[in-house]
Amino acid sequence: MSRLIVVCIVISMICGALSLSSTKMADEKKEKDEDEKPKISGGTVIAAGRLTLDLLKTLLGTLGSISRKIAIGVDNETGGLITGNNVYFRSGTSDDILPHRVETGEALLYTARKTKGPVATGAVGVFTYYLSDGNTLAVLFSVPFDYNFYSNWWNVKIYSGKRNADYDMYHELYYDANPFEGDDTWEYRYLGYGMRMEGYMNSPGEAILKITVMPD
């Protein structure tokens, strides 16, 4: 009888050790998988196939608890290289450097936010990229501070030749060049120069903007 009890105790100890070992191995595998997951951050370039609305929401979360912020993804399907030029901010700022080289089949990620502190600003600006044909792609984003008077807006335009983002470009894209309201709707537009675009922006103060530029 005593031998049976000893055998049972030994078996129980072995099973416990195996269970603990399996749990440890599972935890180590989970940690390894997490480490191997491609990290996302603003100011980077990813494969275009990875650019989804969910990825932009994840990117938005990296900015922390800021009430006015935006995560932007632009999928380059133009057939050529696009080269980052400059950013103009009407309000707010960014912690990112505009990605410099985005090959066709790649997507750029960029984030912007309101200025930190108790200041009544949103995240509003324009950035530009030079296309391989020598023209300029401009992207407007606008996440206002006060939703009693304003809404989210965005726009995309191709300018002839090389242009810098500045106040005049912002003013044209926001007021005159038929901007799109960020109202959770997909939009489509012919851009000229043999290109067209499709894009989506949502309506909250924590916004995402996804744009694809492609041949017409």
Swiss-Prot record:
Region span, N-terminal region: 48-67
Alphabetized UniProt keyword annotations: Cytolysis, Ion transport, Membrane, Nematocyst, Secreted, Signal, Target cell membrane, Target membrane, Toxin, Transmembrane, Transport
Region (Plays an important role in the hemolytic activity): 40-49
Annotated compartments: Secreted; Nematocyst; Target cell membrane
Keyword NAD recorded: no
Main location: secreted
Signal sequence coordinates: 1-19
A GO molecular-function annotation: toxin activity
Annotated propeptide span(s): 20-38
Coiled coil start-end: none
Residues bound to phosphocholine: 91, 124, 142, 144, 170, 174-175
Pfam families reported in the protein's UniProt record: Anemone_cytotox
InterPro entries tied to this protein: Actinoporin_PFT (IPR050677), Anemon_actinoporin-like (IPR009104), Cytolysin/lectin (IPR015926)
Region (Trp-rich region, which is important for the binding to lipid membrane): 142-157
Task of the protein: Pore-forming protein that forms cations-selective hydrophilic pores of around 1 nm and causes cytolysis. Pore formation is a multi-step process that involves specific recognition of membrane sphingomyelin (but neither cholesterol nor phosphatidylcholine) using aromatic rich region and adjacent phosphocholine (POC) binding site, firm binding to the membrane (mainly driven by hydrophobic interactions) accompanied by the transfer of the N-terminal region to the lipid-water interface and finally pore formation after oligomerization of monomers.
Domain notes: Composed of a long N-terminal alpha-helix and a core region rich in beta-sheet structures. Before the pore formation, the alpha-helix binds the lipid membrane, partitions into the lipid-water interface and stabilizes the monomeric molecule on the membrane. Finally, it traverses the bilayer, thus forming the transmembrane pore.
Protein family (similarity comment): Belongs to the actinoporin family. Sea anemone subfamily.
Subunit structure: Octamer or nonamer in membranes. Monomer in the soluble state.
The protein's name in its UniProt record: DELTA-sagatoxin-Srs1a
